[in-house]
Structures are given as C-alpha cells and as structure tokens.
A protein has these predicted regions:
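A short glycine/serine-rich beta->alpha loop
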Residues: 5-8, 97, 136-137
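Flexible, acidic active-site loops/lids enriched in D/E/S/T/G that coordinate Mg2+ and/or position polar
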Residues: 35-119
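A short, surface-exposed helix-loop junction/capping segment
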Residues: 19-31, 156-164
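Residue-level detector of alpha-helix boundaries and kinks
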Residues: 7, 27-31, 80
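N-terminal hydrophobic or amphipathic helices/low-complexity stretches enriched
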Residues: 1-18
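Acidic beta-strand-loop-alpha-helix segment within the catalytic core
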Residues: 109-166
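Alpha/propeptide regions of enzymes that mature by internal proteolysis
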Residues: 13, 22-32, 38, 42, ...
Length: 166
C-alpha cells in the first residue's frame, strides 16, 4: 500500500483546476456560479484519478452552496486493496463572494489524511492557517496576523525579490 504523499499530485492538480475554473469567473457577481465551476473542476479531476478518496469534511450544507458532499467517493480505484483509502476535507472555493466580486483572498482548500484520521466536525466555518512543517511550532491561529508573520519571518526571512505584493 502506498503512502499518502504518493498521491499528492492528483490532489494538487484538483486544487489547481478548481482555482483556475473559478478564477475565470472573478467579478461575475454570482457566488454560486463561481463556486459551481470550482466544484465541477475538482470533482471531475478527482473522479478520473487513480485514487480511493472520500469527502469527510465538506462545505455547502450551511449555505446551500454547490459542494462536494460529505461521504462522496471520488476516484477510479474505490475499495481496491492495493490503494490507500484517503479522507479529504475540502472547500473548492473558499470566500466565494470575494471571487464573485473580484476581491482578494478567495482560495481552494483541501486537507488529506488516511481514512478515519480526519476529525469529523459539525458544519461550521473555521479559520485556516496554511504553512509548511518548518512553521509548525512557530505560528498559531491564536496569534494576530502581525504576530504570526513576525514569528514566521524570524524562522525564515523572505528575500524582498521573492515578494510580489499588490
């Protein structure tokens, strides 16, 4: 059986395709249209991948938005013994309103774990913090943005030539 990291390219591709699909609708002023484009792109990509994935945490029930639904199975290798079963937490388009209004900070969100390892939370909105392992003990959702950035910079300074601010 493979390790979860062996499947990463399929999930990266799914988030990229979802991001591109909704980015093409930035400024369309229709939240559901942008969200549906991201959902369709992500679902199609994952349904055609040689994976055994299940949505453990999804988004959509709260606000009746288009969604990958909890319990939905994705992939061409469902229930195969030679494939690692994977649970996903997913929101194909986080901040749909921002995308529809051509505002910043919309993103595609996905987390992976071996089957059964994701905490099953009730439908609720959550804060998200995305870092590499390098920052695991450095930043926290309990910190202000300024504090988190300052602490991150103390671990790994960012070269000014790498910064592409707006």
């Amino acid at each position: 059986m493979k390790n979860i990291i062996d499947y990463k390219d399929y999930f990266i591709r799914a988030t990229e395709y979802a991001a591109v699909a909704c980015a093409q609708l930035r400024g369309c002023e229709d939240n559901n249209k942008a969200d549906q484009a991201a959902v369709n792109a992500m679902r199609t990509t994952l349904m055609n991948a040689p994976i055994d994935a299940r949505v453990a945490i999804g988004e959509g029930e709260i606000d009746e938005a288009p969604m990958l639904y909890i319990g939905e199975k994705l992939g061409t290798h469902i229930d195969r013994e030679d494939v690692l079963p994977i649970d996903i937490a997913v929101d194909p388009l986080e901040c749909t309103k921002n995308c529809a209004n051509d505002d910043p900070n919309a993103m595609t969100v996905m987390a992976l774990s071996p089957k059964g390892d994701l905490f099953r939370a009730p439908d609720t909105y959550m804060n998200k913090l995305v870092t590499s392992r390098l920052f695991k003990d450095v930043v926290s959702l309990d910190f202000s943005m300024e504090c988190a950035l300052s602490r991150s910079y103390s671990v790994k300074p960012m070269a000014s030539s790498n910064f592409k601010g707006s």
